[in-house]
Amino acid sequence: MAVISMKQLLEAGVHFGHQTRRWNPKMKKYIFTERNGIYIIDLQKTVKKVEEAYNFIKQVSEDGGRVLFVGTKKQAQESVKAEAERAGQFYVNQRWLGGILTNYKTISKRIKRISEIEKMEEDGLFDVLPKKEVVELKKEYDRLIKFLGGIRDMKSMPQALFVVDPRKERNAIAEARKLNIPIVGIVDTNCDPDEIDYVIPANDDAIRAVKLLTGKMADAVLEGQQGVSNDEVAAEQNINLDEKEESQEAESTEENTTVESN
């Protein structure tokens, strides 16, 4: 069964590219035709590319890896947050702060500040501090959560990056490429596909299209996690089986020894 259907893609408007005057010639192989000055993306290729990206993300997840979802344009913000959270992954859906990947040591200090402020409130310090200072602390906290809340539990580098619109997320892509982190991306007709390891040729401006494709990548993560769970259960069952066999062998040996001595 295909990961995604042509019907789903058509209904979400995935096939609508940019105006013909705003295009990247490198995307030519993913374009089906032109209609009323708009490029139409070849959805047969999109179906195939979604499957390739899905299988890659699934494997990353199955191997115990984590995915960082990135989409800071308005059309992507809600879907990126919702789908990343659904799959238990990291996300950045506001402005990309330089160094999130390449200077994580510094970024992690700012993330630590989130917990510090939370502890101050839990310990009742907000009740004794001057009101003005509490207001400033709350503003700082809200700002940190807004920009770093989606990566506050990211203790090490992700094993894959999923981006919506490579043009918009060029800084995130540059950092990922420096660290050789594979990139999956929704790539419209005005983008450079060479920057992306797993290209999903699609409309990156329609909310429904972005939600559909981001959701499929989250599904891939969840399916991979299910594979991990199944493997862990199988491994545990094998261990229990081995222990049972060893126990039975020991009992058998003990019985034989008793018989021989009698």
UniProtKB/Swiss-Prot annotation:
CDD domains: RPS2. GO terms for cellular component: cytosolic small ribosomal subunit. It comes from Staphylococcus haemolyticus (strain JCSC1435). Belongs to the universal ribosomal protein uS2 family. Residues 243-254 have a biased composition (Acidic residues). Keywords: Ribonucleoprotein, Ribosomal protein. GO terms for molecular function: structural constituent of ribosome. GO terms for biological process: translation. Pfam families: Ribosomal_S2 (PF00318). InterPro entries: Ribosomal_uS2, Ribosomal_uS2_bac/mit/plastid, Ribosomal_uS2_CS, Ribosomal_uS2_flav_dom_sf. Residues 240-262 are annotated as: Disordered. It comes from the Bacteria. This is Small ribosomal subunit protein uS2.
